[in-house]
């Protein structure tokens, strides 16, 4: 295609798309945050499955109590922490704000609250282990309170990041819906 400006008309060489074809920032952010939350949900699922396995072995007495101790009380309500993760996953396909809000609220109730209770429940045993070097519950030869505190710290971090990213995703979705209402 020839023109007076030269062999090719200006703007037809493919360089004119940069000012037109851009994905809105809140859509880019939504995709990124969904991916991060999914990764955290999968890490939470691994923690949850390990906890279920430990509790099953303890209750079914598949191994002696010298190897696997009975579960702490905080572990039972923590089993419900799978509910917020499922609600979070259900909110992703259609950007369902109500499921995401339910996920965030139930995460505080079913995930964070049992972890706080667990840290308080295990504190006397951890204090005794630190001061006197005596442990009464064991998990494959290790002090159960030490192992469970490591799990607890990891779970707190996973849920805190999950809440943080969920809040940012919620803000991103609100931006998107506000722009649609203006049009």
UniProtKB/Swiss-Prot annotation:
Keyword Phosphoprotein: yes
Cytoplasmic domain ranges by topology: 1-39, 93-96, 159-183
Membrane topology: Multi-pass membrane protein
Species: Mus musculus
InterPro entries: Jagunal
Keyword Phosphoprotein recorded: yes
Modified residues (Phosphoserine): 3
Principal subcellular localisation of the protein: endoplasmic reticulum
Subunit structure: Interacts with COPA, COPB2 and COPG2.
KO phenotype (gene knockout): Lethality around embryonic day 8.5. Mice carrying a hematopoietic lineage-specific deletion of Jagn1 show defects in neutrophil-dependent immune response to the fungal pathogen Candida albicans. Neutrophils display defects in the glycosylation of proteins involved in cell adhesion and cytotoxicity as well as impaired migration in response to Candida albicans infection and impaired formation of cytotoxic granules.
Name recorded for this polypeptide: Protein jagunal homolog 1
Compartments, as annotated in UniProt: Endoplasmic reticulum membrane
Pfam families: Jagunal (PF07086)
Function description: Endoplasmic reticulum transmembrane protein involved in vesicle-mediated transport, which is required for neutrophil function. Required for vesicle-mediated transport; it is however unclear whether it is involved in early secretory pathway or intracellular protein transport.
Lumenal compartment spans: 61-71, 118-137
Annotated TM spans: 40-60, 72-92, 97-117, 138-158
Family named by the database record: Belongs to the jagunal family.
Keywords associated with the record: Endoplasmic reticulum, Immunity, Membrane, Phosphoprotein, Protein transport, Transmembrane, Transmembrane helix, Transport
GO process terms (BP): defense response to fungus; endoplasmic reticulum organization; granulocyte colony-stimulating factor signaling pathway; insulin metabolic process; insulin secretion; negative regulation of insulin secretion involved in cellular response to glucose stimulus; neutrophil mediated immunity; neutrophil migration
Gene Ontology cellular component terms for the protein in this record: endoplasmic reticulum; endoplasmic reticulum membrane
